[in-house]
Amino acid sequence: MDSIVGDAIDEAEAEDMGDESAQVDGAANINRSGTMTDDELKAVLKDLQTNITVVGCGGAGGNTVNRMHEEGIKGAKLVAANTDVQHLVEIGADTKILMGEQKTQGRGAGSLPQVGEEAALESQEEIYDAIEGSDMVFVTAGLGGGTGTGSAPVVAKAARESGALTIAIVTTPFTAEGEVRRTNAEAGLERLRDVSDTVIVVPNDRLLDAVGKLPVRQAFKVSDEVLMRSVKGITELITKPGLVNLDFADVKTVMERGGVAMIGLGESDSESKAQESVKSALRSPLLDVDISGANSALVNVTGGSDMSIEEAEGVVEEIYDRIDPDARIIWGTSVDDELEGMMRTMIVVTGVESPQIYGRNGEAQAHAEERLEDIDYVE
């Protein structure tokens, strides 16, 4: 299909039907007076490795971590944090945290964000231990419910205080989920904006353009898949070698204090796959925003071994033509042998304004800031 959202639908349908190299000495004692051996160079590289942690909060966040575990993502530690022990035991992760055991007895937060927040505060020590030493922390959750909405800001705050670049990637509820969940999502988003460098918002309502005819269960699986692909796309910009490499400093340039961001995902296997993949990303229902006003963009172009630098540059040129000429654009490109004859484009734009994001237009933003301290979760 033309977009990664469509690909995510295929993944959800398929799932529903089925119901390092040797260790070297540390770099500290390396002879730095001249030439270096391969082992010494590897040791330097190891010391410079970016430590990335992904923390999935609540049910949706846990599902994201589980999908990343299934995908075999490289270079990131996976942490699942939940108040529901039954859900937590089914998740594949490097570390699992049962938050608020005394508060909830492992029975969940009952769709109450205040309970999720208190549970996370009870388990702060375990949260700090899980993210210790991280250079970058992704906090992923579905906003509107109890555990994810309440705990994600607590986790993000801990990550930021530890010195990590903190990126939250969250979904907002389908309208059909009701006003209470929407109100709680708004409160959770405001809290996340206060404690994260960048918050990437994936509005579930926009997914309805692609999944409107799917059963509810599969629609939520598509949402989980999009979260996973978003985190994976940014992570592997740093961890996977590419034709045009990005490093942690590049990503930090765009994401540090980036504010609210949105993401576009697209792919194409046509003869004009470079142009079509970027157009698909820019048309993505998730990227419900005029990118001409964005202040920064992070672009990841992935293709098969047949992809040329010229094709990758064509993607970036298309974005340059549409964005503020003063905006900062950082891009990288990598090869995935499974994408022979195909190209995928991921665009993250920061400093955006969109009706899908609570409080982002001028008057609403000012009003939100005035009442921020009064915003609370609805029981």
UniProtKB/Swiss-Prot annotation:
GO terms for biological process: cell division; FtsZ-dependent cytokinesis; protein polymerization; regulation of cell shape. The keyword Zinc does not apply. SMART domains: Tubulin, Tubulin_C. Changing residue 250 to A: Defective in cell division inhibiting ring formation. Is not able to complement the deletion mutant of this gene. The keyword GTP-binding applies. It comes from the Archaea. It is found in: Cytoplasm. InterPro entries: Cell_div_FtsZ, Cell_div_FtsZ_CS, FtsZ/CetZ, FtsZ_C, Tub_FtsZ_C, Tubulin/FtsZ_2-layer-sand-dom, Tubulin/FtsZ_GTPase_sf, Tubulin_FtsZ_GTPase. GO terms for cellular component: cell division site; cytoplasm; cytoplasmic side of membrane. SUPFAM superfamilies: Tubulin C-terminal domain-like, Tubulin nucleotide-binding domain-like. Residues 8-19 have a biased composition (Acidic residues). GO terms for molecular function: GTP binding; GTPase activity. Belongs to the FtsZ family. Homodimer. Polymerizes to form a dynamic ring structure in a strictly GTP-dependent manner. Interacts directly with several other division proteins. This is Cell division protein FtsZ 1. The gene is ftsZ1.
